[in-house]
Design a protein with these regions (language model features):
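Exposed, flexible binding/inhibitory loops of compact, secreted disulfide-stabilized domains
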Residues: 3-144
């Protein structure tokens, strides 16, 4: 039964119309110092919801959300949670409209042995913005 359900889910993804690239922009630099205490990946359709999340994860010291025209755009915040050094980074690989969803594909870069890093807690994250598409957003972590 599980195999049947899994097979149907895979077939649904394979049989859909081809993926359509979604243009996006990275606004991470407009929110310096954000510290996300656990992995996250979610879409925000309003400034107030994004601000509420920032306040929830950084009480008393949350940065203000960047200027985003939420009448036209939506934002997606992805974060890997705390990491032990400066060598970690997140990269948005691509954003695609696929069937009835928008897929945001993310890859975490980890430092290799011998790479110069500083041992301190870091919080890799990306905040991206794209034109509002009235479909659910799925964050897909590649390589995990």
């Amino acid at each position: 039964m599980v195999a049947l359900i899994l097979g149907a889910a895979i077939w649904d993804r394979v049989s859909d119309e081809p993926a359509k690239a979604v243009r996006w922009r990275d606004v991470t630099a407009e929110v310096p110092g954000l510290e996300l205490p656990r992995p996250t990946g979610r879409a925000y359709g309003s400034r107030s919801k994004l601000a509420d999340y920032f306040r929830a994860v950084m009480p008393g010291r949350a940065p203000a959300p960047p200027r985003i025209d939420f009448r036209r755009d939506e934002a997606v915040l992805v974060g890997s949670g705390p990491r032990s050094s400066t060598g970690y980074d997140l990269r948005v690989v691509r954003v695609e409209e696929r069937g009835d969803t928008v897929d945001v594909r993310v890859r975490e870069r980890t430092p290799s042995l011998g790479e110069p890093t500083e041992a301190r807690i870091t919080y890799p994250y990306r905040l991206i913005v794209f034109k509002r598409i009235d479909k659910p957003v799925h964050v897909i972590w590649e390589g995990r």
